[in-house]
């Protein structure tokens, strides 16, 4: 257990702006919370340089067969699992490429297991269970920057030569000193003292969104701002797939539906077939040669 005193942590400080939150009308209470929330995006903005470095590292790892692994406890762990679980349907990647690990295991997603965060060895065990390797990226998430579970994971990852990234909301935290890249949006004291599921959690969610989205953009999963590798696994996504191809190519619905049927709803391949006027086999060959980057594939045939 780390010996950092809680009274030195920004996230545990008392917020003078909300000290009367229990004595005001509902609307005023919500305005207080909203005013605090407005500070989050600005805090994240100050960390963009560090976030960019992290995105570049993650994208490079993906291209070299590595994975993105989030570890955290409590709210931080849940946010990692949430971000990871959205990557396969959005970008068509395997469930193994981006993974979230929460202290205490799957049951901790639904019921707090606070004691699990106090063990460094538990995180090391969890990482070994997924065969975490030096080509993978470890992102340790903890508002305080002092959670033993996460620190144990970062130390282990450093020890095997993997790239480590910390996402915290306290400046100069222990985690930030251990990680290769430190991302620390300082959002200030919470509206409810110590309730880091609020501003800190929001900041962490924004950062994780940037990390995964940025890496997917860097690895050709996006064309323009369209998610061209999505998996059309339900009616909503089937319709979205059609709209994406229409938006990307300017084609009529009838043509798009025909091409999507031919490609078994491979959105990226459908777009490139229309843009290139190539048949499916040739289009796939060129697309694969260019590692799925539509822009690069189009350049090759121009």
UniProtKB/Swiss-Prot annotation:
This protein's pathway: Amino-sugar metabolism; N-acetylmuramate degradation
Is-annotated flag, keyword Hydrolase? Answer: no
Active site: which residues?
Answer: 86, 117
Is Metal-binding found in the keyword set? no
From the UniProt record, list the reaction(s) this protein catalyses.
Answer: N-acetyl-D-muramate 6-phosphate + H2O = N-acetyl-D-glucosamine 6-phosphate + (R)-lactate
One of the Pfam families matching this protein, by short name:
GKRP_SIS_N
Report the GO molecular function annotations.
carbohydrate derivative binding; carbon-oxygen lyase activity; ether hydrolase activity
Q: How would you classify this enzyme at the top EC level?
A: lyase
Give UniProt keywords alphabetically: Carbohydrate metabolism, Lyase
Q: Name the EC number(s).
A: 4.2.1.126
Q: Which GO terms describe its biological process?
A: amino sugar catabolic process; N-acetylmuramic acid catabolic process; peptidoglycan turnover
| Residues of the SIS domain | 58-221
* HAMAP family per UniProt: MurQ (MF_00068)
Similarity annotation: Belongs to the GCKR-like family. MurNAc-6-P etherase subfamily.
Assembly behavior: Homodimer.
What more the UniProt record tells us is: A lyase-type mechanism (elimination/hydration) is suggested for the cleavage of the lactyl ether bond of MurNAc 6-phosphate, with the formation of an alpha,beta-unsaturated aldehyde intermediate with (E)-stereochemistry, followed by the syn addition of water to give product.
Q: What does this protein do?
A: Specifically catalyzes the cleavage of the D-lactyl ether substituent of MurNAc 6-phosphate, producing GlcNAc 6-phosphate and D-lactate.
Name of this chain's protein: N-acetylmuramic acid 6-phosphate etherase
């Amino acid at each position: 257990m780390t010996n950092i005193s809680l009274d030195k942590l920004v996230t545990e400080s008392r917020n003078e702006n909300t000290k009367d939150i229990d004595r005001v009308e509902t609307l005023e209470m919500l305005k207080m919370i909203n005013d605090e929330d407005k500070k989050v995006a600005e805090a994240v903005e100050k960390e963009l340089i560090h976030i960019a470095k992290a995105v570049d590292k993650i994208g490079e790892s993906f291209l070299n067969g590595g994975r993105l692994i989030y570890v955290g406890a409590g709210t931080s762990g849940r946010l990692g699992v949430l971000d990871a679980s959205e990557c396969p349907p959005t970008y068509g990647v395997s469930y193994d490429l981006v993974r979230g690990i929460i202290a205490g295991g799957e049951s901790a997603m639904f019921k707090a297991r606070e004691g699990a965060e106090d063990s460094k060895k538990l995180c090391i065990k969890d990482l070994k269970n997924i065969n975490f390797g030096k080509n993978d990226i470890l992102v340790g998430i903890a508002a305080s920057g002092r959670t033993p579970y996460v620190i144990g994971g970062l130390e282990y990852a450093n020890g095997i030569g993997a790239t480590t990234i910390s996402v915290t909301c306290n400046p100069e935290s222990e985690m930030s000193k251990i990680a290769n890249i430190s991302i620390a949006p300082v959002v200030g004291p919470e509206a409810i003292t110590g309730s880091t599921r609020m501003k800190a959690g929001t900041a962490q969610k924004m950062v994780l969104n940037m990390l995964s989205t940025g890496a997917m953009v860097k690895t050709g999963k996006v064309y323009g701002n369209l998610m061209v590798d999505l998996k059309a696994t339900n009616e909503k996504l089937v319709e979205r797939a059609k709209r994406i191809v229409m938006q990307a190519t300017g084609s009529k619905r009838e043509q798009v539906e025909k091409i999507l049927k031919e490609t078994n709803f491979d959105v990226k391949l459908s777009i490139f077939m229309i843009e290139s006027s190539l048949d499916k086999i040739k289009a796939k060959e060129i697309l694969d040669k260019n590692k799925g980057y539509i822009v690069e594939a189009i350049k090759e045939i121009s």
